[in-house]
Amino acid sequence: MATTPIEKLRLRRTQQSTIYEAVSAAILLVMWIIGIVAIARHKAETDILIALTTISIAAVLLHLASYRPTQRWVRNDFEIKTVRQAVVASKFYRIFAIEVAMFGLFIAINGLIHFKNKVPEVIKGGTVVSIVFVTHIAAHRKLKKVREAEKLEQQQKSAER
């Protein structure tokens, strides 16, 4: 059986990945429905369509990146060296896709009911940034644990020889 180089690795679809994609698709569908209703009721400008389109494309690209996390176009800030690391990165790309979709949903809801005028400025800007930052930190920590476990396994194998 031939081995695939890590640069050409493509992860398979799993039940978990399908669930993440279905959740993301449902959020995007609701986002678009609310956005179109907001425009139809003249509560939002048509510029909201540009934001919703951009967010939809970003969510789709993140799901695509989850299947090929080692590709150069994905632009990880960490180097993936093993399949286990690729699987961990893949899960976080899917979680990030759902976060991006939720951000779009909040934009659409704001277009309909204008809740941003009722929320303090700190909460408006800080919430989204903090959620993305916490996800990034969690992914980095999980990858670090995976790398440490792999080093430990490697040391145990070399000690057995």
Predicted regions span which residues?
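Select subsegments of transmembrane alpha-helices in polytopic membrane proteins
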Residues: 18-28, 61-64, 89-101
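Membrane-water interface of transmembrane alpha-helices
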Residues: 57-77, 136-146
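Alpha-helical transmembrane segments and their immediate juxtamembrane interface regions
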Residues: 120-158
